[in-house]
């Protein structure tokens, strides 16, 4: 009789499948950004037409496209823009939009409020990039829409569509982190092709900033050479940078134009200057962007001849910089009726200030522990041990000097430990303050002074570093006017690296003696 076979051990169970991408995230409801970059076959159909919905859904998930696809989109859009006139002419019905500033998820909300670009005519007044952290997504999406709807979606240039500001603020850094410097340079070439103004329905002049003392007629705009980096002064600069005077409609001065002290360049224009321009060019009003508005828009004093607001400002970036708490708005003009549609901000993914990575962000935590260990190691030796060791090898004077040197080293490391401790304990305040400065740098001496210095960073120190004026991290910004006042320093034209900064102000006499500056008959009309 055969012996019974021993029971065989059951095979080990197969290893569990790896968790899905992003399953280990702290906030499970937030999906992990796709790692796959869209290819040409995914973005363009067989006829080379962009699949805008595919691109939109991918960008909303924080996805990216192949670099060559990004370059193709930017260059094809730029080719269309180059064929347009410096002052384009558009007809109603149309939806006019103000600043976007890299707030891509709010741009998606804008199209929900304003209507699908497939059946709605749009005019954007510039400032698509900088300050927000999704600027390249805004450019790619708007440029694809321009390729799809070249005769119904129009894009003007803002003061931020230039090399000078995008290098100083965030757009260049964003392009290099998400794509490459090639993509950034392609964007700059495309920005040089953007028209400067639009004539809406033969009734409204639409522009990013406003008027210039060197522009008297619409033909003066048509003659401008726009295919270049905007200069620090002159009519092209003024179209992008000028503002209505702070007492617009209630001026005490008779001067139509005065130096723009807020921007550090260009001019303030007043109510009589606007009325004179409107009358000379048979227009109803000027529609512009360039300034944040609490309600998303502002209607200025009415013209005495037409009874219509002489000037309208529209701003389409809600909760600007995540601190303004403002509404955004778009202007819909149809059948000689103007409607304002407001909307609030939408949730968006979080980026550390200035695109900081997690390793840089965690450095204060690591640094505090390392310096703490160094302080403890150096603090082991007592004063008696230092003096005893010194007596064996040196005279009393040398021992005292050596003791002082070691004490200085301990104090230096202790100071470094305090800096890292402040960085760790006040990390949120530090990141907030750095994120609100265009250079990403803290005022000198803030960290070394400890927590109290950080919490009471002075107006003078912050101004010296071009940070938000008077910002104190523990202080919560409570109103739109407060946020706008604190951010005022960032509204100025930044200093130029390659030349002495022009004050931007030419006297009117100088302006009139250089009438040909910034103009040329060889530009697109």
UniProtKB/Swiss-Prot annotation:
Q: Where is this region: Autoinhibitory domain?
A: 475-497
Record-listed Phosphoserine modification sites:
479
* Cofactor(s) needed: Fe(3+); Zn(2+)
Map out region (Calmodulin-binding) in residue numbers. Answer: 402-416
Report the principal subcellular site.
cytoplasm
Tissue-wise expression? Expressed in kidney, in the thick ascending limb epithelium and in the collecting duct, but not in the distal convoluted tubule (at protein level). Expressed in the brain and the bicep, tricep, soleus and gastrocnemius muscles (at protein level). Expressed in the salivary gland (at protein level). Expressed in hippocampal neuron nuclei and adjacent white matter tracts in the CA1 region of the hippocampus (at protein level).
Q: Does the keyword Aminoacyl-tRNA synthetase apply?
A: no
Annotated region (Calcineurin B binding) at 357-379
* Catalytic function, reaction form: O-phospho-L-seryl-[protein] + H2O = L-seryl-[protein] + phosphate; O-phospho-L-threonyl-[protein] + H2O = L-threonyl-[protein] + phosphate
Assigned EC number = 3.1.3.16
Instruction: Provide the residue span(s) of the region labelled Autoinhibitory segment.
Output: 417-424
**PROSITE patterns recorded:** SER_THR_PHOSPHATASE (PS00125)
Q: What else is known?
A: Unlike for protein substrates, PPP3CB activity towards synthetic phosphatase substrate p-nitrophenyl phosphate (pNPP) is increased in presence of the immunosuppressant complex FKBP12-FK506.
- What is the recorded function of this protein according to its Swiss-Prot or TrEMBL entry? Calcium-dependent, calmodulin-stimulated protein phosphatase which plays an essential role in the transduction of intracellular Ca(2+)-mediated signals. Dephosphorylates TFEB in response to lysosomal Ca(2+) release, resulting in TFEB nuclear translocation and stimulation of lysosomal biogenesis. Dephosphorylates and activates transcription factor NFATC1. Dephosphorylates and inactivates transcription factor ELK1. Dephosphorylates DARPP32. Negatively regulates MAP3K14/NIK signaling via inhibition of nuclear translocation of the transcription factors RELA and RELB.
Q: What is this protein called?
A: Serine/threonine-protein phosphatase 2B catalytic subunit beta isoform
Q: Which organism is it from?
A: Mus musculus
